[in-house]
């Protein structure tokens, strides 16, 4: 990764009556614009996210999406949909006076990158996508219902289902929704920690015991659940795949971990079949962007796409 430099410009943008989103710029003010779209939904961005881009070459824009990270109010699901986030990205671009930019997103960030590019293809110079997630029911069931990745980590799964009454475990996402939006804050925080611990375990190529902070877990647990319950506000299983024609002209590199248990290879494969113009690069890695094989592959992907952006 590149040196992590401090932002030269940052602030908050009022994007609705309720929400203010945090934004920052680092790197070269006159460089090639790139926006980093974090995962989750609700994960927020970290300073390390700047490190995928050469700060001498890129004007690096990072935002925290509605309800998470440094954005305000925290863990708020009201007025918080995929299409709200797409509109927010455009508001940031317009505020910063950027004509077109490279869009870089992983996991949920890949969903949002594709949704944004398909809505505003004229504003996208290129796409670098990692850990493809299309927000299809089959993908959320794999993650958070019995019979998916639960078969691989049954001991961790037992902890994940523990907050849910046995007679509700046939619809865990719905059952968790009731807990994560409960009026009792202790109920919310306990459920959020169980949800986040499960996911944190899955994203590591070499899993280790995790103990996430309950309050820090609330945004990702609540917002992921909110989006999953609502199908990401996408119309059907092939909502993104059926609109690839809008972005086939955009230079695109897909980086996918072969052993990714959070966003399995099948979604990257489906995207590459629908979008043969994109280059699919499969890495011997899991899901987490900061694992060394994925870091190297992502930095290389950004370097390789650069000539197409100039």
UniProtKB/Swiss-Prot annotation:
<feature type="active site">
    <location>
        <position position="260"/>
    </location>
</feature>
<feature type="domain" description="AB hydrolase-1">
    <location>
        <begin position="33"/>
        <end position="290"/>
    </location>
</feature>
<dbReference type="GO" id="GO:0005737">
    <property type="term" value="C:cytoplasm"/>
</dbReference>
<feature type="active site" description="Proton donor">
    <location>
        <position position="287"/>
    </location>
</feature>
<dbReference type="InterPro" id="IPR000073">
    <property type="entry name" value="AB_hydrolase_1"/>
</dbReference>
<keyword id="KW-0645">Protease</keyword>
<comment type="function">
    <text>Specifically catalyzes the removal of N-terminal proline residues from peptides.</text>
</comment>
<dbReference type="Pfam" id="PF00561">
    <property type="entry name" value="Abhydrolase_1"/>
</dbReference>
<feature type="active site" description="Nucleophile">
    <location>
        <position position="107"/>
    </location>
</feature>
<keyword id="KW-0963">Cytoplasm</keyword>
<keyword id="KW-0378">Hydrolase</keyword>
<dbReference type="InterPro" id="IPR005944">
    <property type="entry name" value="Pro_iminopeptidase"/>
</dbReference>
<dbReference type="InterPro" id="IPR029058">
    <property type="entry name" value="AB_hydrolase_fold"/>
</dbReference>
<comment type="similarity">
    <text>Belongs to the peptidase S33 family.</text>
</comment>
<dbReference type="GO" id="GO:0004177">
    <property type="term" value="F:aminopeptidase activity"/>
</dbReference>
<keyword id="KW-0031">Aminopeptidase</keyword>
<dbReference type="GO" id="GO:0006508">
    <property type="term" value="P:proteolysis"/>
</dbReference>
<dbReference type="InterPro" id="IPR002410">
    <property type="entry name" value="Peptidase_S33"/>
</dbReference>
<protein>
    <recommendedName>
        <fullName>Proline iminopeptidase</fullName>
        <ecNumber>3.4.11.5</ecNumber>
    </recommendedName>
</protein>
């Amino acid at each position: 990764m590149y040196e992590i430099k401090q932002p030269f410009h940052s602030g908050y943008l009022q994007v609705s009556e309720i929400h203010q989103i945090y934004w920052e710029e680092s790197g070269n003010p006159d460089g090639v614009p790139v926006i980093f779209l974090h995962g989750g939904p609700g994960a927020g961005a970290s300073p390390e996210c700047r490190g995928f881009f050469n700060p001498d070459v890129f004007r690096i824009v990072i935002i925290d999406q509605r309800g998470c990270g440094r954005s305000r109010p925290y863990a708020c699901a009201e007025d918080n949909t995929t299409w709200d986030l797409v509109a927010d990205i455009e508001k940031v671009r317009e505020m910063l006076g950027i004509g077109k930019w490279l869009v870089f997103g992983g996991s949920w960030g890949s969903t949002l990158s594709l949704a944004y590019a398909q809505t505003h293809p004229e504003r996208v110079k290129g796409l670098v996508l990692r850990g493809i997630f299309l927000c299809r029911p089959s993908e959320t069931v794999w993650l958070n219902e019995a019979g998916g990745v639960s078969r691989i980590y049954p001991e961790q799964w037992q902890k994940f289902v523990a907050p849910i009454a046995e007679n509700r475990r046939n619809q865990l996402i719905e059952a968790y929704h009731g807990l994560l939006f409960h009026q009792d804050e202790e109920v919310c925080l306990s459920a959020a920690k169980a949800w986040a611990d499960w996911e944190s375990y899955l994203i590591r190529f070499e899993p280790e015991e995790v103990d996430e902070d309950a309050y820090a877990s609330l945004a990702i647990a609540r917002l992921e659940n909110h989006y999953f319950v609502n199908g990401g506000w996408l119309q059907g299983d092939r909502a993104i795949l059926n609109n690839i024609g809008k972005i086939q002209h955009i230079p695109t590199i897909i980086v996918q971990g072969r052993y990714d248990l959070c966003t399995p290879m099948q979604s990257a494969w489906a995207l590459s079949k629908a979008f043969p113009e994109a280059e699919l690069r499969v890495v011997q890695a899991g899901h987490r962007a900061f694992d060394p094989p994925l870091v190297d592959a992502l930095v290389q992907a950004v370097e390789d796409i650069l000539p197409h952006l100039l």
